[in-house]
């Protein structure tokens, strides 16, 4: 008897919902065109009405990063028009951006940037990676995997691998740590001094902090003439040319100005990865950021938990960057998984 009542209640609920939705859509359609009961026309009208209902949402995720008017703090900082990747079409830097970028890692006599970029795009494609272009509808889930020791014994691996995109950075290994950090990598952010060998299908995103960084990537896949920047670097790398992407210097400045408010000398690869992902993804989850549960700052592949010299260089403001990501999580723009 109880089962019959539950079944009856479900049927009645479904009928009421169906009548309400049908009435709503028909009334809405009536204001646009004369209502017709031809099946094909009905489907078209319902489809158009659904599009109108969801058009104000930039994605189909529970929380869409690009959705505005939910946080004044976010709206003041997030600028969707700033392009994260350098291409042949957007390669010209404004003077103030160029002067600022030249100061990040000073060179004695940097070569002409325009000539360097022209040579760069003779060797690598000068187009945006089609994978990274935002879709009009959908939910692109991305994992940004940092290098914190809090990933050890976290068992996040399968969860990380379930994302559409998995972004890693610098010298981060996966071999030997698969259970905690996963095996999947779609994009890997590096600069010449932090490069590591990548998988065949991994897109390399070069983060250039100086002119020679752009020259190095050309050299490393052709002549192999550059072996030193401010420290020895790999002479040759094995990366497919169509898998090489360049982080836009103007986007680095955008992160520094808008998100870091001028804190630190320039942004870390970690925060650059986070803001980059917010511009190409609909939903972003962070793993391996911050200290472990004991307050130690170290890399997950290191056996010395008390390490953490990277926080003491004076180049990056780790505390301010951490506050930015914490605020983004508090307003439901990203999620942070803190591990152990």
UniProtKB/Swiss-Prot annotation:
GO terms for molecular function: beta-D-galactosyl-(1->3)-N-acetyl-beta-D-galactosaminide alpha-2,3- sialyltransferase; beta-galactoside (CMP) alpha-2,3-sialyltransferase activity. Keywords: Disulfide bond, Glycoprotein, Glycosyltransferase, Golgi apparatus, Lipid metabolism, Membrane, Secreted, Signal-anchor, Transferase, Transmembrane, Transmembrane helix. It catalyses: a beta-D-galactosyl-(1->3)-N-acetyl-alpha-D-galactosaminyl derivative + CMP-N-acetyl-beta-neuraminate = an N-acetyl-alpha-neuraminyl-(2->3)-beta-D-galactosyl-(1->3)-N-acetyl-alpha-D-galactosaminyl derivative + CMP + H(+); a ganglioside GM1 + CMP-N-acetyl-beta-neuraminate = a ganglioside GD1a + CMP + H(+); a ganglioside GM1 (d18:1(4E)) + CMP-N-acetyl-beta-neuraminate = a ganglioside GD1a (d18:1(4E)) + CMP + H(+); ganglioside GM1 (d18:1(4E)/18:0) + CMP-N-acetyl-beta-neuraminate = ganglioside GD1a (18:1(4E)/18:0) + CMP + H(+). InterPro entries: Beta-gal_alpha2-3_sialyltrans, Glyco_trans_29, GT29-like_sf, Sialyl_trans. Its EC number is 2.4.3.4, 2.4.3.2. Substrate binds at residues 105, 147, 170, 230, 266, 270, 290, 299, 316. It holds the Pfam family Glyco_transf_29. It is a single-pass type II membrane protein. Glycans are attached at residues 79, 114, 201, 323. The keyword Transferase applies. The chain crosses the membrane at residues 14-34. GO terms for cellular component: extracellular region; Golgi medial cisterna membrane; Golgi trans cisterna membrane; membrane; trans-Golgi network membrane. Residues 35-340 are lumenal. GO terms for biological process: ganglioside biosynthetic process via lactosylceramide; N-acetylneuraminate metabolic process; protein glycosylation; protein N-linked glycosylation; protein sialylation; sialylation. Its main location: Golgi. The soluble form derives from the membrane form by proteolytic processing. Disulfide bonds join 59-64, 61-139, 142-281. It is found in: Golgi apparatus, Golgi stack membrane; Golgi apparatus, trans-Golgi network membrane; Secreted. The keyword Transmembrane applies. Pathway: Protein modification; protein glycosylation; Glycolipid biosynthesis. Residues 1-13 are cytoplasmic. Belongs to the glycosyltransferase 29 family. PANTHER family: ALPHA-2,3-SIALYLTRANSFERASE ST3GAL I ISOFORM X1, CMP-N-ACETYLNEURAMINATE-BETA-GALACTOSAMIDE-ALPHA-2,3-SIALYLTRANSFERASE 1. A beta-galactoside alpha2->3 sialyltransferase involved in terminal sialylation of glycoproteins and glycolipids. Catalyzes the transfer of sialic acid (N-acetyl-neuraminic acid; Neu5Ac) from the nucleotide sugar donor CMP-Neu5Ac onto acceptor Galbeta-(1->3)-GalNAc-terminated glycoconjugates through an alpha2-3 linkage. Adds sialic acid to the core 1 O-glycan, Galbeta-(1->3)-GalNAc-O-Ser/Thr, which is a major structure of mucin-type O-glycans. This is CMP-N-acetylneuraminate-beta-galactosamide-alpha-2,3-sialyltransferase 1. The lineage of its organism: Eukaryota, Metazoa, Chordata, Craniata, Vertebrata. The gene is ST3GAL1.
């Amino acid at each position: 008897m109880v089962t019959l009542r539950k079944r009856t209640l479900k049927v009645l609920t479904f009928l009421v919902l169906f009548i309400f939705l049908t009435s709503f859509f028909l009334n809405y359609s009536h204001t646009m065109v004369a209502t017709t009961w031809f099946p094909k026309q009905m489907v078209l009208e319902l489809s158009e009405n659904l599009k109108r209902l969801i058009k104000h949402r930039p994605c189909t995720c529970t929380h869409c990063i690009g959705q505005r008017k939910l946080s004044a703090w976010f709206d003041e900082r997030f600028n969707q028009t700033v392009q994260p990747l350098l291409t042949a079409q957007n390669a010209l830097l404004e003077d103030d951006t160029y002067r600022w970028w030249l100061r990040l890692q000073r060179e004695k006599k940097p070569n002409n940037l325009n000539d360097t970029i022209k040579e760069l795009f003779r060797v690598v494609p000068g187009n945006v990676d089609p994978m990274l272009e935002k879709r009009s509808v959908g939910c692109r889930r991305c994992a940004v995997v940092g290098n914190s020791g809090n990933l050890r014994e976290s068992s996040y691996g399968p969860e990380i691998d379930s994302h559409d995109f998995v972004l890693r950075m610098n010298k981060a290994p996966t071999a030997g740590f698969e259970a905690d950090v996963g095996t999947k990598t779609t994009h890997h952010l590096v600069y010449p001094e932090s490069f590591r060998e990548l998988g065949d299908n991994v897109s390399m995103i070069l983060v250039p902090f100086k002119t020679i960084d752009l020259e190095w990537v050309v050299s490393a896949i052709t002549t192999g003439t550059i072996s030193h920047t401010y420290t020895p670097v790999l002479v040759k790398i094995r990366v497919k040319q169509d898998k090489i992407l360049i982080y836009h210097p103007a986007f680095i400045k955008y992160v520094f100005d808008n998100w870091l408010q001028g804190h630190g000398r320039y942004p870390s690869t970690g925060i650059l990865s986070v803001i980059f992902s917010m511009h190409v993804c609909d939903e972003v989850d962070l793993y391996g950021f911050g200290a472990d549960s004991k307050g130690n700052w170290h890399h997950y592949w290191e056996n010395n938990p008390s390490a953490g010299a990277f926080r003491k260089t004076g180049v990056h403001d780790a505390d301010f960057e951490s506050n930015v990501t914490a605020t983004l999580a508090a307003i439901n723009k990203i999620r942070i998984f803190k591990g152990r």
